[in-house]
């Protein structure tokens, strides 16, 4: 993991709910990488490392986290 994380992740839902939504995306498969990113953040991975793990730019990771923190799961729907 890189450096110290400055942005905290808001835990809108329990980890078990994230896991369920990843496994059963309900017709929104494009949300799965975003949910995986959030799950990695829940587990303590930095934004940069989590973004790299799901194959997106660091800026996209910061954008996803901002939307998640402000809007919850609905913020990840494109």
Tell where the protein language model's regions lie, with residue ranges.
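Short, basic alpha-helical/linker "hinge" immediately adjacent to a nucleic-acid-recognition surface
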Residues: 1-32, 38-78
